[in-house]
C-alpha cells in the first residue's frame, strides 16, 4: 500500500533519527566484545532509575547495528531503522516482503530489554521461530542478552528455564497455551510464564486478524451420543432448498417454517425449540452448517479417513486442530468417516484477548494498511507504511477478466506456457485445493511440467518454495503457502523478467491479493504480477447484489465467444466493492467474536485472579467459617423471605447441604428448629471439628478442596456458556439483541457458578473426618 500523509510525516520525523544512528557507526567500531557487553550492562542499569532520551536511543541502536554487522554481516539501512523506531512506538510497521523485517526486529527487541522488559517475539510457525532465533539470537547473545526458543512438547522445567530469558521466540498458540496451562496448575511453583511485558508479532496481520476467529482451547473428551450425528445427517440429506435460508458470506444458515416442520416430523417432537428438543436442534443446525456452509477441499480436506481443517489464509492443513462445539463431528458424519468424540473445553482464550494483556504490543508485516481500522479499534495500534530501500521493480498489470472459468483456464495455460518456453519462473496462486487441482489438470493436459503445493502435500513446502525461483519452474500453490520464506531467483532469471505471479482468483481480502503479488519483485528484483479471473469465480458468485446480477447476466448474454478478456470498469468496481463488503463482513465476525469473548474474558480474569491469590497465599482468601456461614444463611434464612411456591427448591438445597455429612443433628430435627439457630449450630460444629486438626493440615485441605471445586465448576460453566451462545444465536431473529441477552444471561450463569462452588465447598467442610480427610 502507498503511504498517506500521516505515514510520510512519521517517516520524515524518524528518517533524521535513523541517519544519526548510521552516522554513529564509528562509536563502537574499535570496541571488543567485552567492551560492547559493558555498554549493554551500562544501559540496563541506567534505565532502572532514569528515563530513556532520544540520544540514548540513538546510541543503543548504533550498538545493536555494530553487533549485527560483526556477527551476521548485515548493516541495517535507514528504512530498517525507521521501521524499528515505528515498532518501538507500539505501532504496526508495514514493510514490503524481502526488505529485512527480521533484522529490523533486532533493534526494537534490544532496546526493550534495555528498558527492563522481557520480550516475546511471535512468528507464524515454529520453523520461522527457530530460524529467526538462530539468526538474530546470535547477535543478541553477542551483546550479553539471553535468548530462548519456546517450542511445543517441552516439560515444565524446560519451560521455566525458557521464560527466564530476556528474549523468547515462539508461536502465538504456544505462548497462549502456556498462559492457559499456568492457570490450571495446583501449585504456584508449577507456573512457567513470567510477566507479559512487550510482544513483537511478525506477520501481524496473519496472527492478529486471520487467526483471531479461532480461539485457543485446552480440552478433554466429552461423553456424548455420537450416533445422533449420523441420524441428523440423514435428515439434512433429505432437505430441499425450500427448507432453509442461507447467508453464506456471513456463514449462517437457519430453518424456515417448512424446514422446522420437516425436522419436527423427523425427530418426532412437537416443537423443535422446546427444552426437550435442545440436543436435536443443536445437532441438526451443526449438520446444516457442515452441509451448506463448509466445503470440502476449501474449508477442510479428508486424508486417510480423517477430516483436517484448511487454514483459509495459507492453504495449509492443520493436523491436530478441530472445529469447535460439534462442527467437526458434523463434518465427519457428512463425509462418512469415523465420528470422534467431541471435546470439552477446560480453558480457552481468543488470540485477541491474549495479546491485549501485554503491557506493550507492536507488529510487523508486508500487508496491514487495508486492515488499519481493525488494528486501531481492537489493538489500539496505528499502521505505518515503511518505504522500500530500493524502488519496487515489479510490473503489476490490470486484471484479465473472462466470462467463464473455462475461458479463464485456457488463458492461464497460454500465459504460463509462453513464459515457461522462455524459461521465466512462474508462481500460480489459487484460493482452494479444488481450483489448485483443476489448474494442475489443465497444465498436465498442455504438457507443462509443474510442482504443486497445497494442504495435501504441505510437508514438502520448504523444498517446493526453494525451487520456485529456478529457471523454467512453474509452481502452483494455494494462497500464501511459503509465506515468511524468500523465493530466491536463479542469477540468469533477472534478464527474463524475474518471477511472474499469476493470480487465478481475487480473494475475499485485498490484503491476501497483495501478499501474493509481493512474492515477486523483492529487493529491487524485476517481477511481474497479474490476476486472471472470471465472472463465475467464488468471490462474485457469493456477492449478493441485484445490480451485479443484472450486469453479469447482460455481459454473459452479449459476450463474444472468442475467449478474450473483457476490460470493464464496472466489473473492476464490482470486484473492489465485493472485496470491501466481504472484508467488512469478516471484520464484523471477528468483532462479534471479541464482543462475546469479552463477557467470558471478564469472568476468566476474575477466576484466574482468585486462583492466583489462592496459590500465592497457599490458603483461602476468606475463612472457611465465613463461607460456610454465608451458604448456611442463604440456605436456611433467605427462604423466609420467599413465597410458598418458591420454597421447595430450598428444602432440597438444605437437604443437599447437610445430607451425608457428619453434622450430628438429623434433617428432620433441623426442620423443627429456628433457621437462625440452625445456622449457628452448623457454624459452631464446624469450628469445633476444624480445631481438632493441625493448622497446616486443615489449611492445605481447605485450599485443595476449594481449588478442586472451583476448577470443576469452571469447566462446567464454560460448557454452559458455549450452550448459551449457541442458543442465543438460534434466538437471534427475535426482537432482542442477542449480545445483550448473552451478557445478561452469562452474568446470571456466572453468579450461579460462584454460588455453586461455594455451596459444595460448604458441604465438603461438613464432611471432615477425624483424620482430616474429605469424604466423597
Swiss-Prot record:
Subunit structure: Monomer and homodimer. Part of the essential Sec protein translocation apparatus which comprises SecA, SecYEG and auxiliary proteins SecDF. Other proteins may also be involved.
Domain of life: Bacteria
PANTHER family membership: CHLOROPLAST PROTEIN-TRANSPORTING ATPASE, SECA INNER MEMBRANE COMPONENT OF SEC PROTEIN SECRETION SYSTEM
Function as written in the Swiss-Prot or TrEMBL entry: Part of the Sec protein translocase complex. Interacts with the SecYEG preprotein conducting channel. Has a central role in coupling the hydrolysis of ATP to the transfer of proteins into and across the cell membrane, serving as an ATP-driven molecular motor driving the stepwise translocation of polypeptide chains across the membrane.
Catalytic activity: ATP + H2O + cellular proteinSide 1 = ADP + phosphate + cellular proteinSide 2
GO CC list: cell envelope Sec protein transport complex; cytosol; plasma membrane
Keywords, comma-separated and alphabetical: ATP-binding, Cell membrane, Cytoplasm, Membrane, Nucleotide-binding, Protein transport, Translocase, Translocation, Transport
Family from the record: Belongs to the SecA family.
Compartments (UniProt record): Cell membrane; Cytoplasm
One Gene Ontology MF term: ATP binding
Record-given protein name: Protein translocase subunit SecA 2
Principal place of residence: membrane
Membrane-protein topology: Peripheral membrane protein
Binding annotation for ATP: 80, 98-102, 486
GO biological process, one term: protein import
CDD domains: DEXDc_SecA, SF2_C_secA
Signal peptide residue numbers: none
EC number per UniProt: 7.4.2.8
Amino acid at each position: 500500500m502507498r503511504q498517506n500523509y500521516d505515514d510520510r510525516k512519521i517517516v520524515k520525523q524518524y528518517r533524521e533519527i535513523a541517519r544519526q544512528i548510521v552516522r554513529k557507526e564509528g562509536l563502537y567500531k574499535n570496541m571488543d566484545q567485552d567492551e560492547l557487553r559493558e555498554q549493554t550492562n551500562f544501559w540496563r542499569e541506567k534505565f532502572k532509575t532514569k528515563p530513556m532520551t532520544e540520544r540514548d536511543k540513538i546510541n543503543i541502536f548504533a550498538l545493536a547495528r555494530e553487533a549485527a554487522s560483526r556477527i551476521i554481516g548485515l548493516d541495517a539501512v535507514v528504512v530498517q531503522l525507521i521501521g524499528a523506531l515505528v515498532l518501538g512506538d507500539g505501532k504496526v510497521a508495514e514493510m514490503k516482503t524481502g526488505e529485512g523485517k527480521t533484522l529490523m526486529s533486532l533493534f526494537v527487541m534490544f532496546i526493550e530489554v534495555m528498558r527492563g522488559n522481557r520480550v516475546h517475539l511471535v512468528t507464524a510457525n515454529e520453523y520461522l521461530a527457530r530460524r529467526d532465533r538462530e539468526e538474530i539470537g546470535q547477535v543478541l547473545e553477542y551483546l550479553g542478552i539471553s535468548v530462548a526458543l519456546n517450542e511445543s512438547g517441552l516439560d515444565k522445567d524446560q519451560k521455566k528455564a525458557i521464560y527466564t530469558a530476556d528474549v523468547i521466540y515462539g508461536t502465538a498458540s504456544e505462548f497462549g497455551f502456556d498462559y492457559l496451562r499456568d492457570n490450571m496448575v495446583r501449585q504456584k511453583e508449577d507456573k512457567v510464564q513470567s510477566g507479559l511485558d512487550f510482544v513483537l508479532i511478525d506477520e501481524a496481520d496473519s496472527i492478529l486478524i486471520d487467526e483471531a476467529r479461532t480461539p485457543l482451547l485446552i480440552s478433554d473428551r466429552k461423553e456424548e451420543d455420537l450416533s445422533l450425528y449420523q441420524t441428523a445427517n440423514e435428515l439434512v440429506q433429505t432437505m430441499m432448498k425450500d427448507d432453509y435460508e442461507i447467508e453464506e458470506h456471513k456463514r449462517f444458515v437457519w430453518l424456515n417454517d417448512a424446514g422446522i416442520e420437516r425436522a419436527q416430523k423427523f425427530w418426532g417432537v412437537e416443537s423443535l425449540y422446546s427444552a426437550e428438543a435442545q440436543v436435536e436442534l443443536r445437532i441438526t443446525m451443526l449438520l446444516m452448517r457442515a452441509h451448506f456452509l463448509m466445503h470440502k477441499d476449501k474449508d477442510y480436506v479428508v486424508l486417510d479417513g480423517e477430516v483436517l481443517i484448511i487454514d483459509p489464509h495459507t492453504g495449509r492443513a492443520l493436523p491436530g486442530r478441530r472445529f469447535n462445539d460439534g462442527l467437526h463431528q458434523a463434518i465427519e458424519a457428512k463425509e462418512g468417516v469415523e465420528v470422534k468424540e467431541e471435546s470439552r473445553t477446560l480453558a480457552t482464550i481468543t488470540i485477541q484477548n491474549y495479546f491485549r494483556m501485554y503491557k506493550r504490543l507492536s507488529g510487523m508485516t508486508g500487508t496491514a494498511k487495508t486492515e488499519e481500522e481493525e488494528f486501531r479499534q481492537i489493538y489500539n495500534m496505528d499502521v505505518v507504511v515503511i518505504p522500500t530501500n530500493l524502488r519496487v521493480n515489479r510490473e503489476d498489470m490490470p486484471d484479465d477478466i473472462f466470462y467463464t472459468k473455462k475461458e479463464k483456464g485456457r488463458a492461464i495455460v497460454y500465459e504460463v506456457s509462453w513464459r515457461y518456453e522462455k524459461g521465466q519462473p512462474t508462481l500460480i496462486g489459487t484460493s482452494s485445493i479444488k481450483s489448485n487441482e483443476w489448474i494442475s489438470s489443465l497444465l498436465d493436459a498442455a504438457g507443462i511440467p509443474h510442482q504443486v503445493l497445497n494442504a495435501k502435500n504441505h510437508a514438502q513446502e520448504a523444498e517446493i518454495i526453494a525451487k520456485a525461483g529456478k529457471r523454467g519452474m512453474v509452481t502452483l500453490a494455494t494462497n500464501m503457502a511459503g509465506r515468511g520464506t524468500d523465493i530466491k531467483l536463479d542469477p540468469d532469471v533477472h534478464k527474463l523478467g524475474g518471477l511472474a505471479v499469476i493470480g487465478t482468483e481475487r480473494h475475499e481480502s485485498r490484503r491476501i491479493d497483495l501478499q501474493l503479488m509481493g512474492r515477486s519483485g523483492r529487493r529491487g528484483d524485476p517481477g511481474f504480477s497479474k490476476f486472471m479471473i472470471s465472472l463465475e469465480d467464488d468471490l462474485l458468485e457469493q456477492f449478493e447484489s441485484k445490480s451485479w446480477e443484472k450486469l453479469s447476466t447482460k455481459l454473459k448474454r452479449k459476450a463474444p465467444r472468442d475467449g478474450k478478456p473483457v476490460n470493464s470498469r464496472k466489473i473492476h468496481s464490482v470486484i473492489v466493492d465485493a472485496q470491501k463488503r466481504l472484508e467488512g463482513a469478516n471484520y464484523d465476525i471477528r468483532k462479534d467474536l471479541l464482543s462475546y469473548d469479552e463477557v467470558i474474558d471478564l469472568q476468566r480474569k476474575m477466576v484466574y485472579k482468585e486462583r492466583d491469590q489462592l496459590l500465592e497465599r497457599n490458603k483461602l482468601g476468606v475463612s472457611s467459617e465465613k463461607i460456610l456461614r454465608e451458604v448456611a444463611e442463604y440456605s436456611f434464612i433467605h427462604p423466609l423471605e420467599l413465597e410458598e411456591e418458591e420454597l421447595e427448591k430450598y428444602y432440597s438445597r438444605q437437604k443437599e447441604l447437610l445430607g451425608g455429612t457428619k453434622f450430628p443433628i438429623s434433617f428432620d430435627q433441623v426442620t423443627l428448629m429456628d433457621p437462625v439457630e440452625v445456622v449457628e449450630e452448623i457454624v459452631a460444629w464446624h469450628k469445633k471439628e476444624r480445631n481438632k486438626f493441625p493448622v497446616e493440615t486443615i489449611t492445605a485441605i481447605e485450599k485443595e478442596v476449594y481449588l478442586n471445586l472451583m476448577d470443576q465448576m469452571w469447566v462446567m460453566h464454560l460448557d454452559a456458556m458455549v450452550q448459551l451462545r449457541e442458543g442465543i444465536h438460534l434466538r437471534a431473529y427475535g426482537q432482542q439483541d442477542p449480545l445483550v441477552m448473552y451478557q445478561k444471561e452469562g452474568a446470571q450463569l456466572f453468579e450461579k457458578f460462584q454460588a455453586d462452588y461455594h455451596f459444595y465447598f460448604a458441604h465438603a467442610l461438613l464432611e471432615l473426618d477425624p483424620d482430616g480427610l474429605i469424604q466423597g
